[in-house]
Amino acid sequence: MKILQLGKFYPVLGGVEKVMFDLTVGLSETGLSEEGFSEVGLSEVGLSEVGLSEVGLSKEGLSEAGLSEEGVECDMMCAGSDGRGTEVIRLNPHGRILCHRTLIEAAKTTIAPSMVTRLRRIAKDYDIIHIHHPDPMAAMALRLSGYKGKVVLHWHSDILSQKALLRFYLPIQNWLIKRADTIVGTTPVYLAESPYLQGVQEKCRCIPIGIEPVISDSAREQEIRNEYSGRRIIFSLGRLVEYKGYRYLIEAAKYLDDSFMILIGGGGPLRESLQREIDELGVGSRVKLLGKVPQEDLASYYGACELFCMSSVMKTEAFGIVQIEAMSAGRPVVATKIPESGVSWVNEDGVSGINVAPRDSKAIAKAILTITDNEATWKKFSAGAAKRFAENFTKEKMISKCLNIYAETLSLH
């Protein structure tokens, strides 16, 4: 089976690109002894009677599934970021990145014409093209490619902030939804609530985002704890932008005592205004803006905190990968119940943490106090967070679910 992941960017800049990259690497590394099709997926393509190991296909079933003995070949086609030119990057024997020079980048959209010409040339080589939305350049390239094979549309989010762009893009988006054989979303909530997917629910499937667990450096973790004199650390991480709702997390500090320390990692355009808010509220002893946290320190901040807080207020926050990073470290989560967003599905209320109404600083503080009130309660939520991660959000589970959906898609006529 040969797959093409189609989208943006490389090098990876954000969550959508990270999912596409991780799928490319994970799928191209899939062999017979690793994650493969489940029995459900195999039966969809008529393979229930061939030899089947517990986690993959036997050699006898390969030809019927259209697979080589080596497993899955998976390439990733994208526009380049950071001035990257057109090049082919070999990831492993079965995976490549086909990177194309970006001529123009505006409104979070790239113009990379060489994607169109290359895709027209090579599209026929792939059994499935897995396109990641929103990305007008990728959609245009697919539209002009003449590709006749199966299409999986990965619906990461609706286009929410670029309204002018959407007016021009909507005809292509509508074509893409109709053209797709299968539509994938990261949560069942977002799939069910998106106004653009209401007429195609029968071909929607869910693949939650999966990641490698974060592993804290114990020495660095202790340094962070010592830096704040053993106070109870509440950690949050993300760009300092309006939809993250950080001012409500800052306001929540008014309802906490000095045994707590809220650390907010990340940079962005609202840094100065958020710092003014901290100063005006008089909570500087309980809230600190860390700025951009070095990648090598992130896991240790998760390890040093008692819980993670996601205060986002808009549907722009569709999933919240930082939540599952915290869960992988066994840290409970306080998140918000954003209408039509999957955030509160990711954080299972009462199990991995507590979900509260958006824009409610008192509710955020109350949830923090509830989880940290006593050791037994914290341990219950900590265990629940670790269990929810292991059962739903590992990279292995994401790859396995994706393979099953490919099998189902290939069986469609």
Labelled PLM ranges:
Residues I131-A138:
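Short His-centered aromatic/hydrophobic patch
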Residues C78, Q173-A219:
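Donor nucleotide-sugar binding/catalytic pocket of nucleotide-sugar-dependent glycosyltransferases
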Residues L4, E223-K254:
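Conserved donor-binding/catalytic core segment of Leloir-type glycosyltransferases
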